[in-house]
């Protein structure tokens, strides 16, 4: 494992199988504070996602990286039928708590939440009776949490195969990743605010790139987050944790997605929710892939 050469995660985080980088509980707690609730989502992101789903007539949505449930909650509140899964039980507990607290609301009583692994997603999540979900979403740089342990991206291909198998014919896959092209060429993330969250708790993010045999193998982000009420006499304290990501570049990830769809899909790429053109002046923080299954 790469942990023998370079510490990829905060101490206490699981290292076997599909890694749960939030398994120590502390990272999950601080992350929940950072991302906040649905009110912390940017208006641009909310309008874009809801508009996209409604434009394509999507009703049944599978969130394959729901984390604390912030996107799923937003979709449930907006009238979508949502199934939410994540590999981290420490993250899921926040979603489960929200469902319990709002169980008297019919939409939340019907909200399905399961622990699931991308490597066995086809077995963990029953496929919709309609042949799949209208839309499958994997947002917030979530897919990059999956490392390339074997060095051949076979885990990535299997995970994408399983994820795309959940999409019905005519349905959508919405999946994103950070602009790792820029990170690898400059050593730091593009400037600008997070396009997903309005949080003001982040004090610093330090970027590191791990290279193995002259190939970028991993990007780590060391977060320093201001946590209210944890310092001296109730003042804000600082919490630090590290998350590691596989650096998916735009061209190679596009190829992985097209292979997963077997060439049967309409594929568009956006940079920070706007149509992206290679060489454009604006450098996006995130690339968002929208694929429609046409088989």
Swiss-Prot record:
Subcellular location: Cytoplasm
Tissue expression as described in the entry: Abundant in liver.
Molecular function as annotated in GO: folic acid binding; glycine binding; glycine N-methyltransferase activity; identical protein binding; S-adenosyl-L-methionine binding
Ligand binding (S-adenosyl-L-methionine): 22, 31, 34, 41, 65, 86-88, 117-118, 139-142, 178, 223
Binding site for (6S)-5-methyl-5,6,7,8-tetrahydrofolate 1: 4, 6, 242
GO biological process annotation, one example: protein homotetramerization
UniProt-listed Enzyme Commission number(s): 2.1.1.20
Record keywords, A-Z: Cytoplasm, Folate-binding, Methyltransferase, Phosphoprotein, S-adenosyl-L-methionine, Transferase
Regulation (activators, inhibitors): Inhibited by 5-methyltetrahydrofolate monoglutamate and by 5-methyltetrahydrofolate pentaglutamate, inhibition is much more effective by the pentaglutamate form than by the monoglutamate form. Two molecules of 5-methyltetrahydrofolate are bound per tetramer. The binding sites are localized between subunits. Inhibitor binding may preclude movements of the polypeptide chain that are necessary for enzyme activity.
Keyword Transferase: yes
Modified residues (Phosphotyrosine): 34
Entry superkingdom: Eukaryota
Residues with the Phosphoserine modification: 10
Catalyzed reaction equations: glycine + S-adenosyl-L-methionine = sarcosine + S-adenosyl-L-homocysteine + H(+)
PROSITE patterns: SAM_GNMT
GO-annotated cellular components: cytosol
Annotated Pfam families: Methyltransf_31
Residue positions, PTM N6-succinyllysine: 46, 193, 198, 203
Protein's job: Catalyzes the methylation of glycine by using S-adenosylmethionine (AdoMet) to form N-methylglycine (sarcosine) with the concomitant production of S-adenosylhomocysteine (AdoHcy), a reaction regulated by the binding of 5-methyltetrahydrofolate. Plays an important role in the regulation of methyl group metabolism by regulating the ratio between S-adenosyl-L-methionine and S-adenosyl-L-homocysteine.
Subunit: Homotetramer.
Assigned protein family: Belongs to the class I-like SAM-binding methyltransferase superfamily. Glycine N-methyltransferase family.
Protein name per the record: Glycine N-methyltransferase
Organism of provenance: Sus scrofa
Gene behind this protein: GNMT
